[in-house]
Amino acid sequence: MYASCERTWLFSLPGWAGRTPGRDAVAEPRRPPGGGGAGGEGLGRSRGGFTTKVHLSADGRCRPLSLVVTAGQRADCTQFEPVLEKVRVPRTGPRRPRNKPDSVACDKAYSNGPCRSYLRRRGIQHAIPEKTDSQAARLRRGSRGGRPPGFDKERYKKRNTVERANNKLKHARAVATRYDKRDYVYLGTVTAAVLAIWLGT
């Protein structure tokens, strides 16, 4: 997710999966109540095998602002609010950190009612393309289908910053290929890589 705030911080919110080596031949651990990944491990089955997904937001300089670690099969849109709620951008002086971006740019994975309603409720502008099936359903209904959601192409072009932030994170071998057993340990590994990115800018 790419977000822009006081000094243009952009939210691009994607999820990407880190592969866990040597786990495919191991019996899957018991899952916690309610489904999801293995209890306390943040691991789950996805098309890439046994994986962990990192959901993050980034500013206009490709620096991660917030992140959430989940099991690999978790849908990106389910972590939209948790990632946005974790954003804190310090201000100069004794003022509280900024936690509301001026705008966000996300891909079609976030083109749904709950995500758009959340942004509308918080007064955040967005650039989220409409899904093809949603567009077709709206057009089928004619005038009853309502107006298409607003979409700013220029703002959406800046979404690449989060993809570049992901690439920077994946330069850390322990992030791209997960070796940590517990999810909180892996979260610490990713956080250390984020700090390295910030210190290098």
Which residues does each predicted region cover?
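Short His-Asn-centered micro-motif
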Residues: 59, 67-70, 106-108
